[in-house]
């Protein structure tokens, strides 16, 4: 690879680092081209999966201001640059790694911090943002309905009490028959 090509590659990778909400770093040793294509398809539109030389990745990360990942750039390295929801990309990679033991998750980078393998797997185990928001909305709706019931309860109890008193006055009791 010529020096100019390397500089262009470093600039492209650095731009991807800067544009990404998260990066997931994997080792792809033993995967076929067909496997890599399948993994790229499984990432849908939320991430791009790129294979590059470790020295170029290290330089690009340095240019992008990303530190703490150098020990991950050993062996055949591929990076998922996540532009969408990190949970979706992490789930796709974790699922693919379960099906294809040759893919090894090495770590990642998100919100200015390096991620361990365990942290990437925890992110993959989270539910998507939309599901969490739906659960929050459902919980809020249920609590609002309970609150409305509590606020209406004293008024309805007072109305039932007034109706019972009126009914009692309207019906002569056994004491008034004497």
Curated annotation (Swiss-Prot):
<dbReference type="GO" id="GO:0006412">
    <property type="term" value="P:translation"/>
</dbReference>
<dbReference type="InterPro" id="IPR047865">
    <property type="entry name" value="Ribosomal_uL10_bac_type"/>
</dbReference>
<dbReference type="GO" id="GO:0003735">
    <property type="term" value="F:structural constituent of ribosome"/>
</dbReference>
<dbReference type="InterPro" id="IPR002363">
    <property type="entry name" value="Ribosomal_uL10_CS_bac"/>
</dbReference>
<dbReference type="GO" id="GO:0005886">
    <property type="term" value="C:plasma membrane"/>
</dbReference>
<dbReference type="InterPro" id="IPR001790">
    <property type="entry name" value="Ribosomal_uL10"/>
</dbReference>
<dbReference type="GO" id="GO:0070180">
    <property type="term" value="F:large ribosomal subunit rRNA binding"/>
</dbReference>
<keyword id="KW-0694">RNA-binding</keyword>
<protein>
    <recommendedName>
        <fullName>Large ribosomal subunit protein uL10</fullName>
    </recommendedName>
</protein>
<dbReference type="GO" id="GO:0022625">
    <property type="term" value="C:cytosolic large ribosomal subunit"/>
</dbReference>
<keyword id="KW-0699">rRNA-binding</keyword>
<dbReference type="InterPro" id="IPR043141">
    <property type="entry name" value="Ribosomal_uL10-like_sf"/>
</dbReference>
<dbReference type="GO" id="GO:0009274">
    <property type="term" value="C:peptidoglycan-based cell wall"/>
</dbReference>
<dbReference type="InterPro" id="IPR022973">
    <property type="entry name" value="Ribosomal_uL10_bac"/>
</dbReference>
<comment type="subunit">
    <text>Part of the ribosomal stalk of the 50S ribosomal subunit. The N-terminus interacts with L11 and the large rRNA to form the base of the stalk. The C-terminus forms an elongated spine to which L12 dimers bind in a sequential fashion forming a multimeric L10(L12)X complex.</text>
</comment>
<keyword id="KW-0689">Ribosomal protein</keyword>
<comment type="function">
    <text>Forms part of the ribosomal stalk, playing a central role in the interaction of the ribosome with GTP-bound translation factors.</text>
</comment>
<comment type="similarity">
    <text>Belongs to the universal ribosomal protein uL10 family.</text>
</comment>
<keyword id="KW-0687">Ribonucleoprotein</keyword>
<dbReference type="Pfam" id="PF00466">
    <property type="entry name" value="Ribosomal_L10"/>
</dbReference>
